[in-house]
Each structure stands twice: as structure tokens, then as C-alpha cells.
Amino acid sequence: MQGSRGQGELFSNALQAGSALTESLPLQQQQLLEWQRRLHAHQAPLFRREPLQSEQTDLFGAGGADPADAIDPLALTPLALNFWRWPESPHSGAAVYLVLDRPAELDQPLLLYVGETMAADRRWKGEHDCKAYLAAYGEALQQCALKPRLSIRFCTDVPQATRARRALEQRLIQRWLPPFNKETRQRWATPFTAES
């Protein structure tokens, strides 16, 4: 059965050729803009403080206020992503942090990542998954002749207890669906990756 062996090699070569082709295809500006528009369609009503269609009114008031509703990303002070290099950090202690971009083509920003920390002044020193995604995102924007306008914002009015703070982080992720959080990455079919 020498024929089946040859077919296997032929099939294997075809797969390798196909993967080389997809690696060499550049990201088009229109693809990136469309990706931003899809994310914006979900997040813009939240930035405008409009209720989500999926949120239903609690007729009996038993649910209580969701602490995630109280966090308005635009009310928080924007900082450069390299804030951690400054001689003195503007924040310390427990915090929830939000990474945003402000595309010129859209009427609202994009919330790209939500995180939590017990040490706001030290969290971004060293390795962080989000840094790699932001670098890939910034590079993709530049290759498409678009300008990134990234910022990070800290909310320090959060629970000190790690479990409660992580629960708040998860509520924010479920609400905003930021594309760089692992919980929601697949939803947005991100057209760029941090892998080389």
C-alpha cells in the first residue's frame, strides 16, 4: 500500500502550505475597524449609562444594587500604560483596573481589559498577559494606519478582601465583555494575537 503513504505526505504538505499562507496575510484596516465596531455596539450603551436590553427590572427589589453598576470607567482618571515607571504611583492598595482605547472613529471608548489587584502600585511591574495583548493590538493598529489612544484607570473604592474583589471583577467582565480577558476572548474573534 505505497499509494496511501504518498497521499499522507501530499496531504501533510498541503496543510503546511495553507498555514504558511494564513501567517503571511496582513490584517486589513477594514477588518480591524469592523472588530472595533462590533465591540463598540455592545459597550457604547454601557458608557452612556443606558440599561442593557438583557437586564430586566426587579419587580420586588430583592436583588439589590449591583456594585459593578457603580463603576463608571469614564469618571476614573486616565493614566498612561507606563504609569508604573513613574517615581510615585498615583494609586496603592486594592483596586479594580480598566484598560481603554479611544478610537477616533467611534463616539465612545472601548474597554479592552478588566483586572483586579491588591497592590495597584505594583500590579503592572513585570510580566502581565494583558501587556502582550495590548502590544499586539497597538502594533495591529499601527500596521493599519490607526492610532492607539490607550489608558488605564484605577478604581480603589473596592473590597479589600480578595474573594469579594474578584467577584466584582467577574461582574464587570460579564457586563462589559472586554476582549482581552480570558473569559471573553473567544467571543470577539480577535483578529490579532500576542503570539509571534
Task: List the model feature ranges, each with a label.
Residues 1-118, 162-167, 190-196:
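GIY-YIG nuclease catalytic motif and its immediate N-terminal context
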Residues 80-83, 128, 184:
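Solvent-exposed, flexible loop/coil residues
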Residues 97-99, 152, 172:
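Generic structural hydrophobic/aromatic packing signal, biased to beta-strands
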Residues 155-196:
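Structure-specific nucleic-acid interaction/processing domains
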Residues 19, 43, 132-133, 141, ...:
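Amphipathic alpha-helical interaction segments
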Residues 89, 119-166:
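Conserved short loop/helix modules at catalytic or binding sites
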